Structure formats: structure tokens, C-alpha cells
Amino acid sequence: MYNGIGLKTARGTGTNGYVQRNLSNFEAGKKRWNKRDATDEVGSDTRLGPDAAILEHERKRAVEVKCMELRVELEDDDVADDEIEERVAQLRETLNAQLAEQTNESAASSYESGRAKETRLRHMGTHQQIQTKQHLDRRFAIAVGVESGYRQADAFNRDLQELKKSERIHQQRQAYQQRQLARASHASTQPPPHPPARCSSTHSQSTSSSSPSSPPRKRARSRSASQDSSARSSSSHASPRSPTPRTTSHVASYSSYSSRSRSRSRSRSPLSHSRSSRSRSRSRSRSRSRSRSPLSHSRSSRSRSPSRSRSPSRCASSRSRSPAHRPRRHSSSRVNPPGPPPRRPAGL
């Protein structure tokens, strides 16, 4: 077998399977098939798109199948032919009406999830599968935010991106102008709002208060003084009222504490005065003694000098006398044994 011509195997043919090529045949302008060019031109199944006529034929065929099922069921029940034809025609009309309302998009969107979807797609035709796949791809693109007319490598095309940017700016300006026109028309049709009565009264009060006779600072001071006087008068008027027991006890304790502190301060004032006078006299005497301190210091130094000179002799005498002045050690452990009794003289 050579170039797709001949038998797949020479077994049983009685020949060696050699096929001689025809060199006299020459095909001018024949283009060699390339896989890359074929995929670019044709594309995948989703790029081709389903055939609308085939899909319409499949839907009509499903209608006729249901009508035939009804006819067979009625014939098995021994129903009259006229009644069978009438009921089948009625079913066909209702199904055709539903078919007219149902579009390709709705038919593609009505699919199940999970195993039911897989089985339904498996039993579908090629064009129905392509239609359902296109619908799913469109839904995914909307969820991700990809435009409908997207093409590969459009993001690297600067001219196209500038054109899209200018179109977006133009659309935004048009939308802004439309909003402004709508607001202007709404404002022109709506009557102006009437000012409330309070605003006019407050305005009149403000105009009357801003009179040139009284400057603003004096008016502010007079207002603060009037507020203080009103607060004092309200406190004086509120004093005769019976306060709560908690506040009365607090006030009574505070007044008793203040009276005790005052009496203590008064009783202690003579002592403090006497103490302050004593401290003043002591400070004066100290200052006088400090002023006389140089002479006393010189005298004390003179008086102390002989004592310092005599100190070695005293130290020596104290050292020599130190054994006598030392305290005796009580030796309780070393006790002398009792000696013999005294002897009487022989003459007695």
C-alpha cells in the first residue's frame, strides 16, 4: 500500500503488494496540507457554532415524536379515528406554540447539573452540544468580566486600546450630560420650596438683635451676666425644696467638717504664733553665734593644742596602767585544792 492506494496487506492476493507510482501525472498548484493552518481557519467546534436549521429540525422532530406516542396510545385504547386525529392535532398546536416561544438560548440554558447534565450532553447531537457549550462559555465570561468580542492579544494592541479608551470617555461624558439635563428638567418642573415660618422669625430676631446702638461685646457680657444671675436665682429658689436624704447628710457632714477645721485652726493659732516667735529668736541667736564663731574657733584651737601635745604621755600612762585596770577573768574551771590544816607550834 502506497499513498493510500492498494491493499492494506498482500496476504492472500498472490502478489508482493508493490504499487508503482505514476510519474506522468503532475498536479500544478497543489497546496500541501498544514495542521496549524487548518486549525486557524476552521477552529474548534465552539468557534464554528451550531447550525440553526438543524436545531430547529430536531425540535420539530421531538414534537412529532410526542404526537406519534399519543396516537399509538389512543389506538391501543380503541378510540375512534376522528377523535384520534382531533386530539393529535390539538397536541401538535400546543407544542408548536411552546416551540415558538422557546428560543435557542433558553433551550441551551435549560440543563441539569452533575450526572444528569453529563448524560444529557452525551445523548445530544453535535450541534446541541456545541450550543450548550457556547452558553456555558458565555456565562463564565460574564462572571469573569471578559467582553463578548474578545480576541487573543488584544491587550497588546495599543491602537485598539486607545480607541476603546476614547470610546469609554465619550460614553461617560454623554451619560454625565444626560444626568445634568435630567436634573435641570426636574428642577424646572418642580416648584420652588416655600421657606418655613421659623426661618423668618429667627431672621427677624437676628436683624433686631444686630442693632448699631449696642456693640457685640457689651451685649455678650450682658447676656453672660443675666445668665449668671438667672442661675443664682434658680439655685436660691430651688434651696427651699426638700432635698434628698443623701444630699442633706453630705452637706451636713461637709459643714461639720469645715466648722471643726476652723475651730482647730483658731485654737492652734496661739501655739503656732508662739512657736514661730521662738523659732525666730532661735534663728537670731544662731546667726549671732555664727557671726562670733571665728573667735571661738581660734580659742578652741588654742585650748586644744596643749591637750594634743600631752596626748602621748597620757596614752603611755594609760598603756602602763592598762593591766591593773583590766577586769579579772573568773576561772571557774581551775579551783585550787584545799591545803593541809595549819600546824600548831610545839611550845604551845
Swiss-Prot record:
Name residues in a coiled coil. Answer: 81-106
List where Basic residues composition bias occurs.
275-291, 322-332
Region (Disordered) residue spans: 101-135, 168-348
Which keywords accompany this UniProt record?
A: Coiled coil, Cytoplasm, mRNA processing, mRNA splicing, Nucleus, Spliceosome
Q: Where is the composition biased (Pro residues)?
A: 337-348
Q: Which residues form the CWF21 domain?
A: 55-98
Low complexity composition bias: which ranges? 172-184, 197-212, 223-260, 308-321
- Give the subcellular location: Cytoplasm; Nucleus
Tell me which Gene Ontology terms the entry assigns under biological process.
Answer: mRNA processing; RNA splicing
GO cellular component terms attached to this protein's record: cytoplasm; nucleus; spliceosomal complex
Q: What does this protein do?
A: Involved in pre-mRNA splicing. May function at or prior to the first catalytic step of splicing at the catalytic center of the spliceosome. May do so by stabilizing the catalytic center or the position of the RNA substrate.
Q: What is this protein called?
A: Pre-mRNA-splicing factor CWC21
Q: Which organism is it from?
A: Mycosarcoma maydis
